[in-house]
Regions:
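Glycine-rich phosphate/pyrophosphate-binding loop shared by adenosine-nucleotide-utilizing enzymes
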Residues: 1, 59-64, 80
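Conserved GNAT-fold acetyl-CoA-binding loop/helix
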Residues: 15, 19-42
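Conserved GNAT acetyl-CoA-binding A-motif
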Residues: 101, 108-118
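A short helix-loop-beta-strand connector motif used in the catalytic cores of GNAT acetyltransferases and
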Residues: 41-54
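A short beta-loop-alpha structural element at the N-terminal edge
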Residues: 2-16
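Conserved beta-strand in the GNAT
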Residues: 54, 60-69, 86
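Conserved acetyl-CoA-binding loop-helix of GNAT-fold acetyltransferases
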Residues: 87, 93-106, 126, 130
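Conserved beta-strand-loop-alpha-helix junction that forms the acyl-donor binding cleft
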Residues: 92, 114-125, 142-148
Length: 149
């Protein structure tokens, strides 16, 4: 298995997988397709705020991971958000998500690694705990800006 950064030739597979992710129980709601497209464009243009990794096995894209970067005084430095981890249904249960988490911990330097999970997704919560994550007792709040980038 190879984890590599998104390239131009990966965009169609990424769009398909991200669309599937946002139409699954792993998220609270779907998002407009142009948000997914804009993320790919931003990453390919070299934004310093995000990376997309393609999970490749035997020449086929079997998943992706979206990372986002921020700075946190509370964490004492850079925070790497594991925003999305998606594995195609036929590749699930083979340790792909676990391998990606370990890859990120080794390849991406950060003072803190952070992620979110649906409250009832006990299987994924167990995976995260096995890899050293623990719950952070904050509630999250958002304010949507009508001016999209």
């Amino acid at each position: 298995m190879v984890f590599r950064k998104l390239g131009e030739g990966d965009v169609a597979a990424y769009l398909e997988m991200a669309t599937d992710f946002y139409n699954s129980p792993a998220v609270l709601h779907s998002i407009p397709q142009n948000y997914i497209e804009n993320t790919a464009k931003a990453v390919l243009s070299g934004t310093p705020f995000a990376d997309i990794y393609v999970f490749e096995e035997n020449g086929a894209a079997i998943g992706y991971g979206l990372l986002a970067y921020t700075y946190s005084q509370e964490a004492g430095g850079t925070v790497c958000w594991l925003e999305e981890i998606y594995v195609r249904p036929e590749a699930r249960g083979a340790g792909v998500g676990a391998a990606f988490i370990e890859f990120v911990k080794e390849a991406v330097f950060a003072a803190r690694y952070r992620l979110e999970v649906e409250p009832d997704n006990t299987r994924v919560k167990a995976l995260y705990r096995r890899h050293g994550f623990s719950p952070l007792a904050y509630e999250s709040y958002v304010l949507e800006n009508g001016k999209k980038q």
